[in-house]
UniProtKB/Swiss-Prot annotation:
Record Gene3D superfamilies: 3.30.420.40, Actin, Chain A, domain 4, Substrate Binding Domain Of DNAk, Chain A, domain 1
Alphabetical list of InterPro entries matching this protein: ATPase_NBD, Chaperone_DnaK, Heat_shock_70_CS, HSP70_peptide-bd_sf, Hsp_70_fam
Triggers of expression: By stress conditions e.g. heat shock.
Pfam families with a match to the protein in the record: HSP70
Name this polypeptide is given: Chaperone protein DnaK
PANTHER family, A to Z: HEAT SHOCK PROTEIN 70KDA
Length: 621
């Protein structure tokens, strides 16, 4: 008896310890830094667990999340569900990453949204998925961007994170993240790695040297307007031309038809990575004078590669530029990593092999490796991953405009960051009272040919002949690749500073307002999500039951069972139409039970028929 008493006390003690550990774990949850690959087509999230990066699945068990946002009935839907309704819902937005850092907006139901706001919806969904998987509140993230993203695009990404309720601890380049994931357990051996990163909307090449735990980016190059979407577009254009030629119909002005073509083109591209030929079948794509139009075409891999040869060739120069900047030849590269879903195309692998003389490493998942690397960087920032030092670079030259519209560089492209550089300038006219500091990004000699990042004025300069005042301009790039500029009059010590903001012009007040709106709508969004899930489940059950009733199972049950099933379906359809969510929620279990009973009855009736038939045959014999 005494032993039993002590055992019970010990069990209670263990339970209390578990509770304390859970509480401490939840308290520590805010210190977790997740790694996010915010992609053009798909996104992915990872976290460090037991010294290794782990991809976090969505509640549906998916390891990647389509970067698609849909607006429907005052509800915002993200991911797979949003992608599934792209054909029928015109208020569905994809590839928003291509607009990051611009002043462009997308309009939905008369309201304009910035690229940051749409990206924030994707990040918010990713954050929620991670929280559900880890059972903890997540507030910190490392987010990846294409290596060739400029300052405005990086700031826009950081702002999107803020709106989503994430403290963006670090912005790192996608190829660098991929190399981190690849080389985490190989960092002791010195070797050079070329990362060929072809995503949905961007293309990057980076060369890194890995040695003694240090990952040093030697060079980077790329094209921010080249990606898998462009390969899809080539197929779309081909289908449109084939239909014009064969059926004398132009589909290019039919939005719904074009969306169906987009889906079909993406599928054909993916399928052609494993097949030599695919069939593109699109029934009832449009209505013509002679009736519905069906598209039935065959596309071979050879034809596809011919259609997209110019796109593939556009990836060659960035590879050559990266090698030139790093002062390396192809033979100096030890490993080639292919990153991004678009690198699964056989033509990409063949091109890389022919240009670099070696086969790419196949031990990484091109869709997941970037998120895994971001999680490792998060681990470094948390102090959980030690003995790793990441030395990244700035992708483009940073300069100011000087007399005659000349672009004068302060920090050259592929300089290791963080970095700070200063230079003395002077006035261009006698008694000039102020200087206009125009900050530029790009490789061109003239200011007008480069991207303007921003400008500010340093005034209060004392009267003096031209060339006498000394104005010190300092450029400082932090570890996120974000630029701060300072101008100081050396005589008076008067200074002016600017942190380059993204060209979409979102102020801190606007960002704060968006964060507040997201927080205020949290409960409402959760309710709408639950309703959407109930609707989806109810519709699935109704469709499944109807299929059973009208199919073979329906023939195997008696009239009374069939009548009860039809009654339940009608009741469910009415509740769904009237949006009686609570009643639907409580009755879903009843409906599932009836569906199970229906299937069981059909099975039993079929078995009874078989037995009766067997008995009848035996009695005849």
């Amino acid at each position: 008896m005494r032993v039993l008493k002590y055992m019970l006390l010990y069990i209670l003690y263990l339970k209390s310890i578990v509770k304390i550990l859970r509480r401490l774990n939840n308290m520590a949850g805010s210190n977790i830094i997740i790694g996010i690959d915010l992609g053009t087509t798909n996104s992915c999230v990872a976290v460090m667990e037991n010294g290794k990066s782990k991809i976090l699945e969505t509640p549906e068990g998916k390891r990647t999340i389509p970067s698609v946002v849909a607006f429907k009935d005052n509800e915002i839907i993200v991911g797979d569900v949003a992608k599934r309704q792209m054909v029928t819902n015109k208020n569905t937005i994809s590839s928003i990453k291509r607009l990051m850092g611009t002043d462009k907006t997308v309009e939905v139901n008369g309201k304009k949204y910035t690229p940051e706001q749409i990206s924030a919806q994707i990040l918010s969904y990713i954050k929620k998925c991670a929280e559900e998987k880890l059972g903890q509140t997540i507030t910190k993230a490392v987010i990846t961007v294409p290596a060739y993203f400029n300052d405005a695009e990086r700031n826009a990404t950081k702002n999107a994170g803020k709106i989503a309720g994430l403290e963006v601890e670090r912005i790192i380049n996608e190829p660098t993240a991929a190399a981190l994931a690849y080389g985490m357990d190989k960092s002791k051996t010195e070797h050079k790695v070329l990362v060929y990163d072809l995503g949905g909307g961007t293309f990057d090449v980076s060369i890194l040297e890995i040695a003694d735990g240090t990952f040093e980016v030697l060079s980077t190059s790329g094209d921010n307007h080249l990606g898998g979407d462009d390969w899809d577009q080539k197929i779309i254009n081909w289908i449109v031309e084939e239909v014009k030629k064969n059926d004398k119909v132009d589909l290019s002005n039919d939005k719904m038809a074009m969306q169906r073509l987009k889906d079909a083109a993406e599928k054909a591209k993916i399928d052609l990575s494993g097949l030599k030929e695919v069939e593109i079948s699109l029934p009832f794509i449009a209505m013509t004078e002679s009736g519905p139009l069906n598209v039935d075409l065959k596309l071979t891999r050879a034809k596809f590669e011919d259609l997209t040869r110019d796109l593939l060739e556009r990836t060659i120069k960035p590879v050559e530029d990266a090698l030139k900047e790093a002062k390396l030849s192809a033979s100096d590269i030890h490993k080639v990593l292919l990153v991004g879903g678009s690198t699964r195309m056989p033509a990409v692998e063949e091109l890389v092999k022919s240009k670099l003389g070696k086969s790419p490493d196949k031990n990484i998942n091109p869709d997941e490796v970037v998120a895994a690397g971001a999680a490792i960087q998060g681990g470094v920032l948390m102090g959980d991953v030690k003995d790793i030092l990441l030395l990244d670079v700035t992708p483009l030259t940073l300069s100011i405009e000087t007399m005659g519209g000349v672009s004068t560089p302060l920090i050259k492209r592929n300089s290791t960051i963080p970095i700070s550089k200063s230079q003395i300038f002077s006035t261009a006219a006698d008694n000039q009272p102020a200087v206009d500091v125009h900050v530029l990004q790009g490789e061109r000699q003239m200011a007008a040919d480069n991207k303007s990042l921003g400008r500010f004025i340093l005034d209060g300069i004392e009267p003096a002949p031209r060339g006498v005042p000394q104005i010190e301009i300092t450029f400082n790039i932090d570890a996120n690749g974000i630029l701060n500029v300072k101008a100081v009059d050396k005589k008076t010590n008067k200074e002016a500073t600017i942190t380059i903001k993204d060209s979409s012009g979102l102020s801190q007040e606007e960002i704060d307002k968006m964060i507040k709106e997201a927080e205020e709508n949290k409960e409402k969004d959760a309710q709408l999500k639950e309703q959407q899930e109930i609707r989806y489940k109810a519709e699935s059950l109704i469709n499944m039951f109807k299929t059973s009733l009208n199919g073979e199972e329906g023939k195997k049950v008696d009239a009374k069972q069939k009548e009860e099933a039809e009654k339940m379906i009608n009741e469910f359809e009415t509740l769904l139409k009237e949006e009686k969510w609570d009643e639907l929620k409580t009755k879903i279990n009843q409906f599932e039970a009836m569906a199970s009973q229906f299937a069981q009855a059909a099975k039993q009736n079929e078995e009874k028929k078989e037995e009766d038939k067997k008995d009848s045959e035996e009695s005849k014999n």
